[in-house]
Amino acid sequence: MTGIIHSLLDTDLYKFTMLQVVLHQFPQTHSLYEFRCRNASTVYPLADIREDLEAELDALCQLRFTHDELGYLRSLRFIKSDFVDYLELFQLQRRFVEIGTDDKDRLNIRIEGPMIQAMFFEIFILAIVNELYFRRLETPAVIEEGERRLQAKAARLKEIAAAQNPDEPPFLISDFGTRRRYKLAWQEHVIRTLLEAAPGIVRGTSNVFLAKKLGITPIGTMAHEFLQAFQALDVRLRNFQKAALESWVHEYRGDLGVALTDVVGMDAFLRDFDLYFAKLFDGLRHDSGDPYVWGDKAYAHYQKLKIDSRTKMLTFSDGLDIERSWALHQYFKDRFKTGFGIGTNLTNDMGHTPLNIVLKLVECNGQSVAKLSDSPGKTMTNNSTFLAYLRQVFDVPEPETP
């Protein structure tokens, strides 16, 4: 039986870009990732898919990169040849993943091992959990509803394409939906449909396998885990963001220049994002909190540094759909270039409640790490003492309880 994942390229580009930095700069780092489902309830307990998940992981850990896949990675200008040589030998090791269930029929997943292994499991496992869960709920009516919603999106993109002023900065969206997709075949169908409807708007996909297959641009730079790791590396905690950005610059020399801002919140990020970084990075990515407030803060920061914000890119990727993206573009288009990464709403809009699942880095080298998101519900750690200390160091207030 062919597994749900049948290519190691079937993941997000930023896994490769982050893995390359880890391999080159801190390859001995040890990490722990933990799974969490944020849904209050599910149609059936996730514990029910445990056996199938175990089998899928066994199959995943048999996969190797093919010569054709390695050739594609080598063609990306920011991927270095020694990294591709490493990937030729690469194979995920099953022993680093533990799967269990608890007395409430919840699924527990722990990935613990070298970061150069553990980091690469995340997207695969989330995509497998999603597909196994929704497979049991599939009916012809579900596919029909998904298709109806997809055609409505395609029609809306055609309208937007017709309304765009060619003299204004373009409205560009990308698929960021691998981790929470309905299944790979559906993700491909969605991208093909939207590309055909509005080729000038659909910029690419975060999924490397589909970017290669469809001949479109793979999109991505860094995730929270990259910055969080520096909370436990050999730098003062207060300086972890600067160290992470410096490390990125050292690796990519101006390429892949979009920085993620919400590991300890936008205000704390901007205190570290000085003139040097602001000139060097092409722009910023929003992933939590009010996107309008966030973008206005970014604009004020660039103004203060006397940088023309119209030369910079704001990328939005937090719970978007086409309408929210278009509204944000209208608001910011005169001040910034914009880009929009749309995830679940593209790849799993079938009428069911999607799974809100994550697999997050919680420890690095035996030390807790955390994210103080601009959205309180996205804060995740297994150590409340460290979280309080992080708040204190970066002067981030406790979120108000409703």
UniProtKB/Swiss-Prot annotation:
UniProt KW Ligase keyword: yes
Record key words, sorted: Ligase, Phosphoprotein, Pyridine nucleotide biosynthesis
Family matches, as InterPro entries: N/Namide_PRibTrfase, NAPRTase_N, Nic_PRibTrfase, Nic_PRibTrfase-Fam, Nicotinate_pribotase-like_C
GO cellular component entries: cytosol
Annotated positions of the Phosphohistidine modification: H224
Superkingdom classification of source: Bacteria
Enzyme Commission numbers on file: 6.3.4.21
Pfam family, one: NAPRTase_N
Pathway named in the protein's UniProt entry: Cofactor biosynthesis; NAD(+) biosynthesis; nicotinate D-ribonucleotide from nicotinate: step 1/1
Gene3D superfamilies: nicotinate phosphoribosyltransferase (3.20.140.10)
A GO biological process held by the record: NAD biosynthetic process via the salvage pathway
Enzymatic reactions: nicotinate + 5-phospho-alpha-D-ribose 1-diphosphate + ATP + H2O = nicotinate beta-D-ribonucleotide + ADP + phosphate + diphosphate
Post-translational modification: Transiently phosphorylated on a His residue during the reaction cycle. Phosphorylation strongly increases the affinity for substrates and increases the rate of nicotinate D-ribonucleotide production. Dephosphorylation regenerates the low-affinity form of the enzyme, leading to product release.
Gene Ontology MF annotations: nicotinate phosphoribosyltransferase activity
Record function comment: Catalyzes the synthesis of beta-nicotinate D-ribonucleotide from nicotinate and 5-phospho-D-ribose 1-phosphate at the expense of ATP.
HAMAP family: NAPRTase (MF_00570)
Entries under PANTHER family matching the protein: NICOTINATE PHOSPHORIBOSYLTRANSFERASE
Assigned protein family: Belongs to the NAPRTase family.
Protein name: Nicotinate phosphoribosyltransferase
Organism: Neisseria meningitidis serogroup B (strain ATCC BAA-335 / MC58)
